[in-house]
């Protein structure tokens, strides 16, 4: 496991309903409720966070492999700088559902204190797992776990 970059507040509780939110940035509006019925891999990240950048290809590969099984990655950037965010997406050809929450309202609902921080939400909207720091999303253990939710 890799280290992360610090931020945050109170944590959301595993086994309880995942806090819902809607994020509107310049390109799109995304609501967690829209993803109900899917397993959501909710990833909070930033372009200024080296472990976040290192983790991104692994997330994208897992998404490509697991999308047909009802798994959706929602990657929320906490970048204040819209230009840096847009440039990063283009430069790295990020092929994930991403949105920028510069005010950090969504990650504050989860008490995110380190980036990247990732939450697994089941098809019923229940928070099942939390990962702090970058992980390898390609491991059989992770993919088996996601496939069983």
Tell where the protein language model's regions lie, with residue ranges:
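Short pre-active-site segment immediately N-terminal to redox-active cysteine/selenocysteine motifs
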Residues: 38-40, 44-48, 114
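N-terminal targeting signals for export/organelle localization
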Residues: 1-22, 140-144, 149
């Amino acid at each position: 496991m890799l280290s992360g970059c610090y931020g945050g507040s109170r944590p959301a509780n595993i086994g309880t309903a995942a806090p819902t939110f809607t994020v509107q940035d310049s390109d799109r509006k995304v609501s967690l409720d829209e993803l109900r019925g899917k397993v959501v891999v909710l990833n909070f990240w930033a372009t200024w966070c080296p472990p976040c950048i290192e983790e991104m290809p692994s997330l994208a590969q897992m998404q490509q492999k697991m999308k047909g099984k009802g798994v959706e990655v929602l990657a929320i950037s906490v970048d204040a700088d819209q230009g840096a965010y847009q440039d990063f997406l283009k430069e790295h050809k990020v092929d994930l559902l991403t949105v920028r929450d510069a005010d950090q309202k969504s990650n504050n609902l989860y008490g995110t204190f380190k980036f990247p921080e990732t939450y697994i939400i089941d098809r019923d909207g229940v928070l099942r797992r939390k990962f702090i720091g970058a992980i390898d999303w390609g491991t059989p253990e992770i993919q088996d776990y996601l496939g069983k939710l």
